[in-house]
A protein has these predicted regions:
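Membrane-integrated ABC transporters
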Residues: 1-42, 135, 151, 238-241, ...
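Transmembrane helix-loop-helix hairpins at lipid-water interfaces of multipass membrane proteins
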Residues: 2-7, 19-82, 162, 167, ...
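ABC transporter TMD-NBD coupling linker
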Residues: 14, 233, 265, 293-362
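An intracellular "coupling" helix at the cytosolic face of ABC transporter transmembrane type-1 domains
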Residues: 18-25, 114, 118, 131-140, ...
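Transmembrane helices of ABC transporter permease
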Residues: 23, 28-37, 68, 142-197, ...
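Helix-loop-helix
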Residues: 50, 54-74, 160-174, 249-318, ...
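Cytoplasmic coupling helices
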Residues: 88-103, 107, 145-149, 171-217, ...
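ABC-type nucleotide-binding domain
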Residues: 340-390
Length: 390
């Protein structure tokens, strides 16, 4: 069976969840441009430094080097400043999107069939509404944004290098593709099983922890504490195993990235040295095309973690959609219609139940003919044997 990065259900669920994030497009575009300029400043810093060192070795007049020296300071300061502002904007976009998604999910759950929620353990529900929503929000900052930056910066770097040496630019483009596309795809397929196992193990860990905390007394009375601890430790072992698998794949990705950088430098030398000997390229330009690739792989190196985040986010989106239901429409939280109170409503809440029957979904009735009237100031106790669902 051919390994896939995402199944069709996961891809569909991820698109569905992203639509509920209601991402501010203009802020995202601003963050994308700032991130591209930040990494572009880093590459420009490396290229300018290479030119400055090579040109200074020829001992020209100081005024010839003054512009380059000032540019080095400019690129160094702007790199840090642009990254800081970009992260402020991008994280605001992601956090606001998570808020929108959670509000929409809560509103949908409040008006949906309670059987879907009751059938889940509390820890599993907590994981889906908590960490799974976070994973979907992280997709914006850790996958979409790095991919856009890598494409923009890579194209700009190759285009600028082509002005000096088309051959070196072609080699750099091939190495960037190897580092930014081929390596992430290979490692993402290897990481998929580890990510799926990790998500399931984290949900099981949350469920086991909630069971231990909330039901400790009942577990102790029935002699099930050791069994609960064993389930908790088993979930931790599964998480650690998935982390080791992801770490191995990440190590291979880092190796391919570093190897691509080395190939780009060696390729630039193999193309540039004959060009210098043929007086097609200057010695200073040779230093630029050789050293620029050293700072050109910063954006493509982020694609490995971006692909891993893609897998995690798609799995999380699928779990959230399974909670709501694949066919259940979800309205944005701000568009939910609020039901007005009756005209004769009192200022204090009053809960009344008449001939109420209680039971689990598809199970026997536990209580029938229950009449209940709860008003402020009145105490009502719900009593019964352990395990009936009080």
């Amino acid at each position: 069976m051919k390994k896939q990065i995402l199944t069709s259900e996961e891809a569909s669920s991820l698109r569905w969840a992203l639509s509920l994030l209601r991402v501010d497009k203009w802020r995202f575009i601003g963050a994308l441009l700032l991130a591209s300029l930040g990494i572009g400043s880093s590459i420009a810093l490396g290229a300018t430094s290479a030119w400055l060192i090579a040109r200074a070795s020829q001992m020209p007049p100081v005024l010839v080097l003054s512009v380059a020296a000032t540019s080095v300071r400019l690129f160094g300061v702007s790199r840090a400043l642009l990254r800081y502002v970009q992260r402020l904007i991008s994280h605001r976009v992601a956090l606001e999107g998570m808020d929108h998604l959670r509000l929409s999910l809560y509103d949908s759950l409040a008006s949906s069939d309670l059987g879907k929620v009751i059938s889940l353990r509390r820890g599993d529900l907590l994981a889906r509404m908590g960490s799974d929503v976070d994973e979907v929000g992280d997709f914006i900052v850790k996958s979409v944004l790095p991919a856009g930056v890598a494409a923009i910066v890579g194209a700009a770097t190759v285009g600028a290098l082509a002005l000096l040496s088309p051959g070196a630019a072609l080699i750099l483009a091939l190495c960037l593709i190897l580092s930014g596309i081929v390596a992430p795809v290979i490692t993402a397929r290897a990481q998929r099983a580890a990510q799926v196992e990790g998500i399931q193990a984290r949900a099981a860990l949350s469920s086991s922890l909630v069971t231990l905390i909330d039901g400790y007394d009942e577990l102790a009375i029935n002699g099930l504490i050791d069994r609960a601890h064993s389930e908790f430790e088993r979930s931790e072992d599964h998480i650690e195993s998935s982390r080791r698998g992801a770490a191995r794949a990440s190590a291979w990705a880092q190796f391919i990235d570093r190897a691509s950088m080395g190939l780009a430098v060696v390729g630039a030398l193999l193309v540039g040295v004959p060009s210098v000997q043929a007086q097609i390229l200057s010695a200073v330009a040779l230093a630029v095309i050789t050293l620029t690739p050293l700072s050109s792989f910063e954006a493509s190196a982020q694609m490995n973690s971006a692909m891993a985040q893609l897998v995690r986010s798609a799995q999380a989106a699928l779990r959230i959609r399974e909670l709501i239901g694949s066919d259940a429409p979800i309205t944005a939280a701000s568009n939910i219609e609020q039901t007005p109170l009756p005209e004769d409503a009192t200022h204090h809440p009053d809960l009344q139940a008449s001939d109420l029957a209680i039971g689990w979904p598809d199970g026997p009735l536990l209580v029938e003919n229950l009449n209940l009237d709860v008003v402020p100031g009145r105490c009502v106790a719900i009593v019964g044997p352990s395990g009936i669902g009080k």
